[in-house]
From Swiss-Prot:
It comes from Rattus norvegicus. Pfam families: PL48. It comes from the Eukaryota. This is Rho family-interacting cell polarization regulator 1. Residues 83-112, 786-828 form a coiled coil. It is found in: Cytoplasm; Golgi apparatus. Residues 371-413, 565-762, 850-874 are annotated as: Disordered. GO terms for molecular function: 14-3-3 protein binding. Transmembrane segments: none annotated.
Length: 1217
């Protein structure tokens, strides 16, 4: 039994029903009789039951084709579908081999009908397996075509944005823009059509109602209605609890067509009377986990507490009902042979008939084709009968003659986990992860026989996986080809698959436009190569021999080279010699092995062989893996290609070659070491950027100078890649340059290397703390200076997405364009917008470079393709590093602008909020207007960019006299550049200046006041614990823009007022009731700012009755003042958008206390969408908002039965009962 992952929706009502009878069972189909009602049938006389089938199909209306493609969702469904198809193949292959073994083990006294029945089932399963393989290949073709269209669409999007950002005026540019737009639309339509076609290949879900289960919830006479919605498909059924405790339902089964983008919505209603129904619960369930080979019994929690569960039996069929093969149910049903076995007589026949002899002759020929086992017509029984029988070898052996010498394999049980007997000693072995066979139906789970060794694929698989099995002594092991077709297939090395995970042979190193899907469970496979060498040196000879005997079972044309490159795995073990000999067309490799050594000890290891479902394929291109060279990022689980060293006499061929097969990598022979890590995670990029990009200037004064671009002259140009302008270290990820789906797209062409492409950031939700951690680049040229240019492109691309939606952003857009033009003029770049447009278009055209790679793959083989020369690669990197970057002439000012530009990009992500909750959006627009003023101030002083700045007064001036503030900033930046100041320095300066005076009021008050000042100025919460890497920094413009909007006339007045507010908040949060009540009585209206109002609202939730009454009275009295009421209204409405549930509850209760009619619409919205606690508080507040609020509450209650809930709590999960 398994539990279906639930995406719960909001409950319509909080119905509390207390009863005392538990669920007593589910009525079986035999006891229910032939009762069947049509879906959505009204109460009344029963309709005539269907004669042909009891299953009703719920897809009379076709599902509409999507208008917007969803590639991320399709990737998830495709991976689940592949796992399900692989499970189907494995289960039926095991069933087929079980039947074949029954045929081989049959005695001569078995009658013809028994063997004929077995053979008929084997043939039926073979046809079904061929059908499954064809179906899987068709799905793979659709997915590959979809991936091609996706990449073409991304490239067209880059072209459209490249042409639109430049605002070209020529006719040719307008025509090009129109053509790119038309191409983007066509690719989008193609993706939608392919999604629809792939959706048609998902098969069917057969759902069978098992019943409701609930402890102390179900009573005799209760009637329930269950409505399931899956896209446009519906299934509504009604049932009741009878006196015996059994359940009777008017509909038993249905069929749903799987959908890509829809979730299964289940709503359970208790029918109490005429138009008096109580909604028990409504949930949405994920259906991608239902692609399994065996039936599954799933349990879904209907209500919040899980006291009501819906039990369904789900059977997935990979084909439609109209096109269902006859052998689809052979595994799920009892074998026909088992049923008929008792009907056959066990007495031996006297004389075999001609029909029997022909049948045995057919079996003999088939056996000879498989493994050369001969049939004998000689009688070996005691009754001297002439009935044909198996020879002694085939008759008395439980398994056929093995192709690879190894003991009898252990049986494999189809369960959630692999058998524990498979150790982790092998190099190719996987960790104990969830296998492709996903099933949780206990009655159907059984022990299936192991895959027969008569198959070469099974033999090779066992040779690579069963490391703990005892292997024979090393020596030549001649192999027998079971079929002649295997040798013919080896010449064309196809992609291989292993356990449901796609892999690619090294012979196809430039494989296909479609990226290989990376299973989440396979992200740690590269570490297994290192762990495999630590399992003990005694296992290495056994592994080596097993791999050798299985590797040379086929001949590859690539092996025609005179030498054979050996594989070396860096390890701490001593070198273990492993002689590999082979007979046949492959020469001996004892004298021609080329050893590639690593900095650590070297251990020769066997050839890594990939196994395809139909034949074996040796891999002549071997892997060189070293713990000191091969790096794997632990956060993003993306293998990074490391140092590849060549010599005139020896070459090390590197390729990513694991069972997950992230992607084939082109052979690297350049002496220049390369480190490629596509799409790194934010945390990893930040940690690594501390060594690549210099940090804040030191205590000594550093004059601002023009940056000089110097080429990289280090022997290890890895820094050119690691310190390249990566926006992941301080801002959003690239948007225009989509991350390649495999490493081969990066290594294949130098034009797509990270050092030559300046990616443009994506709109991804990042915390503001990461933006504030942007380190200051030195004025030494190189990749660090490109951060300003990247930040400009990021913000301009984000502003293009919001163009025309918010008029407030027009000023910010003008200032960004003005800043870009001033920077270009300062660098002496006289290029026009059209010329810069051509460069942008040139970068966008690189999105289509994979089309040329596909043509090269069709024309040339991987072995014949020349690699890029080291001189060309070095020259291109020097050219890219020598490119002149945008800069103001001062590295500190550049870093300041970068921080502001990225802050603007993050603020833009808060715009476009759905629903009536718009406080965060209004706050973001206000901050963006302040950032526009900052950019305006910077642009107005562009003539002074190159001058040395020593004080804050040379940079900013307040509109009104505010003594003390600029002096305080100069004290903070003493010895530093005045543009930037670390927050730690601000805190130290503040405590040294005001700590003595504030500590008289309360110890630690100075730190609390300074932290509040920094958080308000930065617009984010500061971390309470120190962390590694560069800390947050406050710019002079953030300091200036925050002080401009303050009401305090001087620094001294601000410190005094803020200290009073901090003390008030601390008293309100005190655990002493007397302190809280005293603070409420003495709280003046002016000191209740945002933090004080939040503290008051929290008392409405966590305080006792006396404190809650005092808070309500205080809020009602203070809300009479218009200034306080406006401030409190904005604060409490902002709390409704907080992530914390208790904060939202407090905001709802506080809005009820001040009786704000402005909050009626947000409160109604929360009643429909939020959790139960928030909905209850919102209803209570609506009733306190006068007549208008009470009317809205009545309308809400009346519409609860008709309006479905929109969202659900993400913390809820279903449990199996």
């Amino acid at each position: 039994m398994m539990s279906l992952s639930v995406r719960p929706q909001r409950r319509l009502l909080s119905a509390r029903v207390s009863r005392s009878q538990s669920f007593a069972g589910v009525l079986g189909s035999q006891e229910r009789g032939p009762r069947n009602f049509t879906v959505f049938s009204p109460p009344g006389p029963q309709r005539k039951p269907l004669v042909l089938s009891r299953v009703s199909r719920m897809f009379s209306v076709a599902h509409p084709a999507p208008k917007v493609p969803q590639p991320e969702r399709l990737d998830l469904v495709y991976a689940a579908l592949k796992r399900g198809l692989t499970a189907y193949l494995e289960v039926h292959q095991q069933e087929q081999e079980k039947l074949q073994r029954q045929i081989k083990e049959s005695k001569r006294n078995s009658r013809l009908g028994f063997l004929y029945d077995l053979d008929k089932q084997v043939k039926s399963i073979e046809r079904f397996l061929r059908r499954l393989e064809f179906h899987a290949s068709k799905i793979d073709e659709l997915y590959e075509a979809y991936c091609v269209q996706r990449r073409l669409r991304d490239g067209a999007y880059n072209m459209v944005r490249a042409y639109s950002t430049g605002s070209p005026g020529s006719r040719e540019a307008r025509d090009s823009l129109a053509e790119a737009t038309r191409g983007h639309r066509e690719y989008t339509e193609s993706m939608c059509l392919l999604e629809n076609e792939l959706e048609a290949q998902l098969g069917e879900f057969h759902l069978r109602m098992k019943g409701l289960a609930g402890f102390a919830r179900l009573c005799v006479g209760d009637q329930y209605e269950i409505c399931m919605k899956y896209g446009r498909q519906r299934w509504k059924l009604r049932g009741r609890i009878e006196s015996s405790g059994k359940q009777v339902w008017d509909s038993e089964e249905t069929v749903f067509l799987p959908l890509l983008t829809e979730f299964l919505s289940i709503k359970v209603t208790e029918l109490k009377g005429l138009a008096n129904h109580v909604v028990v619960g409504s949930v949405s369930c994920e259906t991608k986990d239902l692609f399994a080979a065996l039936p599954q019994v799933v349990a879904v929690d209907i209500n919040d507490l899980g006291t009501i569960k819906l039990s369904l039996e789900v059977i997935w069929s990979p084909f439609d009902k109209d096109d269902q093969p006859s052998a689809a149910s052979t595994v799920n049903k009892a074998s026909t042979v088992t049923k008929r076995f008792s009907t056959y007589s066990q007495s031996p026949p006297d004389t075999p008939s001609l029909r029997e002899q022909a049948f045995y002759n057919m079996l003999r020929r088939q056996e000879e084709l498989e493994n050369g086992t001969a049939w004998s017509l000689s009688s070996e029984s005691s009754d001297d009968s002439s009935s044909p029988q198996l020879s002694g070898t085939a008759r008395y052996s439980s398994t056929p003659k093995p192709l690879v010498q190894q003991p009898e394999p252990l049986p494999v049980q189809v369960t959630f986990r692999r058998p524990e007997s498979l150790s982790s000693g092998s190099m190719d072995e996987e960790p104990p992860l969830t296998p492709a066979l996903v099933n949780g139906h206990a009655p159907y789970s059984r022990t299936l026989s192991h895959i027969s060794e008569a198959s070469v694929d099974a033999a090779l698989t066992e040779a690579m996986e069963a490391v703990d099995l005892k292997c024979p002594a090393p020596g030549p092991s001649p192999l027998v080809y079971p079929e002649s077709t295997h040798v013919e297939h080896v010449s064309s090395v196809p992609p291989v698959a292993d356990n449901g995970r796609s892999a690619t042979s090294p012979a196809l190193s430039t494989a296909g436009p479609a990226p290989t899907f990376i299973d989440p469970a396979s992200s740690t496979q590269l570490d297994l190569v290192h762990k495999a060498t630590d399992s003990g040196s005694s296992e290495l000879p056994s592994i080596t021999h097993t791999m050798a005997s299985s590797t040379y079972s086929a001949v590859s044309p690539i092996n025609s080279v005179p030498g054979l490159t050996s594989t070396t795995v860096g390890s701490t073990h001593k070198p273990m010699p492993s002689p590999l000999t082979s007979t046949g067309s492959i020469p001996s490799v004892t004298d021609s092995i080329q050893t590639t050594t690593s900095p650590t000890h070297t251990t020769p290891s066997p050839t890594h062989t990939t196994v395809s479902p139909t034949h074996s394929t040796p891999s002549p291109t071997h892997t060189t893996v070293s713990p000191s060279n091969a790096a794997l990022s632990p956060s993003n689980a993306t293998p990074s290609l490391s140092h590849s060293t060549t010599s005139p006499t020896q070459k090390a061929t590197m390729s990513t070659h694991t069972t997950s097969a992230v992607g084939p990598v082109q052979t690297t022979t350049s002496p220049i070491s390369t480190t490629v890590s596509p799409s790194p995670s934010v945390d990893t990029a930040i940690i690594s950027s501390s060594s690549a990009v210099p940090s804040v200037p030191g205590p000594e004064a550093r004059p601002c100078s023009h940056p000089t671009s110097t080429p990289y002259t280090k022997a290890d140009p890895t820094a050119a890649c690691t310190s390249s302008p990566s926006l992941a270290s301080s801002g959003p990820k690239p948007l225009t340059s989509p991350a390649p789906d495999s490493l081969e797209q990066i290594l294949k062409s130098p034009s797509s290397s990270p050092s030559s492409i300046v990616p443009e950031p994506q709109r991804s939700e990042l915390s503001l703390a990461l933006v504030a951690q942007a380190p200051v680049p030195e004025a030494t040229g190189g990749a660090g200076d490109r951060r300003l240019e990247e930040a400009l492109r990021t913000l301009m691309a984000a502003l293009d997405d919001y163009r025309g939606q918010f008029p407030e952003l027009q000023g910010l857009e003008q200032e960004v364009t003005r800043l870009e033009s001033l920077l270009m003029q300062r660098q002496g770049l006289t290029r026009s917008r059209a010329s810069s447009l051509s460069i942008t278009v040139e970068h966008a055209l690189e999105s289509f470079s994979f089309l040329n790679d596909d043509e090269d793959e069709d024309n040339d083989s991987p072995g014949d393709r020349p690699t890029s020369s080291p001189e060309v690669v070095a020259e291109e990197r020097l050219d890219s590093s020598n490119a002149q970057c945008l800069s103001t002439g001062c590295s500190a000012l550049d870093a300041t602008l970068v921080q502001h530009l990225y802050h603007c990009s993050c603020l833009l992500l808060k715009l476009g909020t759905f629903g009536p909750l718009r406080c965060q959006e209004a706050w973001a627009l206000e901050r963006l207007l302040r950032e526009a003023r900052v950019l305006q101030e910077v642009c107005e002083h562009s003539k002074l960019w190159g001058n040395a700045v020593t004080s804050a007064q040379e940079v900013v001036q307040f509109s009104a006299s505010r003594p003390g503030f600029l002096t305080f900033w100069d004290q903070c930046t003493e010895g530093l550049n005045p543009f930037l100041c670390p927050v730690e320095q601000v805190l130290l300066t503040f405590c040294s200046q005001y700590g003595a005076r504030l500590s008289l009021r309360q110890p630690g008050l100075a730190e609390a006041v300074c932290v509040k000042f920094l958080e308000d100025a930065l617009g984010q919460k500061l971390p309470r614990r120190p962390h590694s890497g560069p800390g947050e920094q406050l710019t002079i413009f953030q300091f200036w823009s925050y002080v401009e909007v303050l009401d305090s006339p001087s620094m001294e007045a601000y410190v005094t007022e803020t200290a009073e507010e901090v003390l008030l908040v601390q008293n309100l949060n005190s655990d002493d009731q007397a302190v809280v009540l005293k603070a409420l009585r003495l709280a003046p209206e002016g000191r209740l700012r945002k933090d004080g109002l939040r503290a008051l609202s929290s008392l409405l939730v966590h305080g006792n009755s006396k404190v809650m009454a005092a808070v309500s009275t205080q809020l009602r009295s203070l809300s009479l003042g218009p200034v306080f009421r406006e401030r409190a209204l904005l604060c409490f409405l902002d709390q409704l958008e907080d992530e914390d549930v208790q904060t939202r509850v407090a905001g709802c209760l506080a809005l009820g206390c001040i009786k704000a009619p402005e909050g009626i619409e947000p409160l109604v919205y929360l009643c429909q969408t939020d959790t139960e606690a928030v909905r209850e508080a919102a209803r209570q507040s609506l009733q306190q908002c006068g007549e208008e609020g009470q009317s809205a509450h009545r309308q809400l209650e009346e519409s609860l039965d008709a309006l479905p809930c929109l969202f659900g709590p993400s913390s809820m999960a279903s449990t199996a009962f």
